[in-house]
Amino acid sequence: MLARFGLFFIILSLGFHQGIAQDRYAVFFTYKPQTNFSLSNPEKFLSQKSILRRNRDKIPFDSLDFPVASKYTLGMRPHIQEILYTSKWMNAAVVVTDSEKSKTLQALPYVKKVELVAKGFYSRSGNRLDSLPPSSKWANRVMDNQSNAYDFQNQLIGIPDMHKAGFTGKGVLVAIFDAGFPGIKESPAFAHLFANKQIQGELDVVRPWNKDVFTKNQHGTNVASLILANQPGVLVSGAYNAQVILALTEDEATEYKIEEFNWIRAAEFADSLGVDIINSSLGYLDFDDPGMNYSTSQLDGKSTYVSQGAAIAGKKGILVVNSVGNGGAAGNSSLVAPADAPGILSVGSVTSSSTLSSFSSKGPTADGRIKPELVAFGQGPTLIRSNGAVGAAAGTSFSAPQLAALAAGLWEAKPSWTKEELWKSLVKSGSQFAQPDNALGYGIPNFRAAYFGELLGISGTEPSSWTIYPNPMTSEQVSILFGKELEVVVRLIDPAGRVYFDQKVNRISSSAPFEITLKDLPSGIFIIQLFDKKQVGTLKLIKP
């Protein structure tokens, strides 16, 4: 979440108490000695599924897989009130202590540095103990508009084709990091998760002693519905048969750097269970304590803790799908961490006419890489609320999970693919792969193009050579110039997902246009999807 751009969702305030000087610190260790674990026996510290994922991607085990040395955590105890958790990837512990004792921690011979990551702490009674006033820093982008049928958001990225081919994410493990998942137990859209025992893990990192993640903010429920919902006629999402890990990483009341460590802790937990995909509709740049803020020059994929964690997850064979942010009004380089991390998919938002949503953050990263990589419909997709009702919302929070679902179905279809192969296939399927930019990235991905791309050698062509005319339409006849093949599949859909045309069309030569007749087409803006043996394209058509 990000205060600066009013990202993602409304946060409810919690009660505070005054006068408590205990804060939360990250304690980084210099070394990582091990006596109980060996790289030759990874089954001692990783699940079988995690080991299989490493083997599939030919990823060696390394010291990052080892836990923090227990003798270090034991040695700290006289100087702290509590250890909240440790991070093996950061070789650190997040602890509760006061400022004076933090200085004694810094003096320990095995401590590299101590950093304040949050003011105050949570007691096990559930109360927030902090000397700062409550905060409600995030602006809401949730709309009460319920007119958007889910068909459109699915059609845009090829979910119907994926389902028709029999792929619904089965056997793929997806982790969702968010601020809570209320209503999931009661909602019919999620009933199958419990009937089929698809929930493989639950973790509250904010309050590690809490065992109930089906509470707090409904943002996580909204996000989860765009991956997992299966309620025909209401919402059927792309990967409803996927297995899932639900992790509560966001502190509703405040915005401190500890949430980066919460994210990393959840990623380590998910990794240990063998997760395939992480969906994170979260982002960080500015904090309640200005001294913790990052500058845009630090969005280089390696300067923020959370981007380091996301990059490590990617190197472990996990596909991280992250919202690029809702700071589009700020212009270029308005993304947030960890969307800047290398090797992940950062996701922006488009409107129902496939143009960039005004709120969608833009790249590039500080080191010049294209961001976002891909986009999906984020300006009003249909989703499920915590009360089980259908709704619609806007934000890159809601475009990212749609692509996480697409990735899960594609990985089910191609189980031998490495994470890198999956990433490349999704990117190459983008509607503007040949001419990427820092607004739409490589464009809108598509299941059919990603699935067949490996076999058919999909590559981009100059989008400027793709033309539909007359546009706006002046008659029922429309001509399309696209690619060099003699046959193309043409699909025409409206913003509600209704399909008006879906046929194979032929032409006599590669220089001739494809000709189609669109009878009884109502007035409006339509999206034409084009598929041949080499590429996929997306064009807009206007009917006055």
Enumerate the language-model features and the residues they cover.
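Subtilisin-like serine protease catalytic core
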Residues: Q22, L39, P160-E259, L273-D276, ...
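Primarily auto-inhibitory N-terminal propeptides
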Residues: Q22-E82, K101-K103, K112-R124
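Autoinhibitory propeptides
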Residues: K71-N154, M162-H163, P342
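C-terminal subdomain of the subtilisin-like protease fold in secreted/lumenal serine endopeptidases
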Residues: D151, V275-N279, E412-N471
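Substrate-binding/access-modulating region of protease and related hydrolase catalytic domains
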Residues: H163, N230-G233, A247-D340, A366-R369, ...
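Catalytic-core environment of secreted peptidases
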Residues: P188-Q200, S352-S397
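Hydrolase catalytic cores
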Residues: I227, A247-D251, S334, G378-L440
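C-terminal outer-membrane/trafficking sorting elements
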Residues: E462-Y469, M473-P544
